[in-house]
A protein has these predicted regions:
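N-terminal and secondary-structure boundary signal
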Residues: 1-213
């Protein structure tokens, strides 16, 4: 199924044609307001999850908070109440738990004062807040989804393109599939490690490399 793709060029030809204004026009072009509250199911005081990647410490290629603010404003214009969200990483990093993840997000500018919306970790403090959802698909009969996504009335997904050590690159699909899963769901997607006993010499070198100890 094909869908329209809208492109906003980075070049600014006049002061009123700045990038923030272009993001607002993109929101209008895709009909964000109608998509946030389809068939009237989402309205005043309902919550909308804005899923994005807050960036790892030391990186600067995440979406700029002032860009995200424009999307927040568009969602708020519908009467809904947005919040920014993501999940804990499986690997040990500055986003491995909600405390470190929030501090990283704040350092990168994703504060309520800038984005005008709260930041809530979707899978709880230690990635234990999730539900098993039946899907009955090829690879999984059920999948683990972070609780905040299931509690929201609607979701807006903001993705940025980036390199990935294992997959080559990551974008919108990974932002949803891996990004909406708690650590337990990420383990399921990566596949479980299996000890090849005839080759294992019990050296223990694999233990410190395991993100889940």
């Amino acid at each position: 199924m094909s869908v329209p793709v809208y492109l906003a060029k980075l070049a600014v030809k006049n002061p009123s044609d700045h990038r923030l204004a272009k993001i607002k026009r993109l929101c209008d072009a895709v009909g964000l307001a109608d998509k946030v509250k389809p068939l009237g199911t989402v309205g005043e005081d309902e919550v909308v999850a804005i899923k994005l990647h807050f960036g790892e410490a030391g990186n600067d290629t995440y979406l700029h908070p002032t860009f995200v603010r424009q999307v927040v404003d568009c969602v708020k214009a519908t009467g809904a109440r947005p919040f920014l969200t993501d999940t804990c990483t499986l690997y040990k990093s500055t986003r491995h738990n909600a405390v470190d993840h929030l501090e990283t997000a704040y350092r990168h500018g994703f504060t309520p004062y800038v984005v005008d919306a709260p930041v809530i970790m979707a899978d709880g403090v230690t990635s234990k807040c999730y539900e098993e959802v039946a899907v009955n698909l090829k690879h999984f009969a059920s999948v683990k989804i972070a609780q905040a996504f299931l509690s929201a009335n609607a979701m807006v997904v903001l993705s940025h393109f980036k390199g990935h050590a294992m997959g080559g690159f990551g974008g919108a699909i990974k932002n949803l599939a891996m990004g909406c899963a708690p650590q337990a769901g990420k383990i399921d997607q990566h596949g479980r490690n299996v000890v090849i006993y005839p080759k294992c010499i019990g050296c223990g070198q694999c233990v410190p490399l395991c993100p889940r100890n």
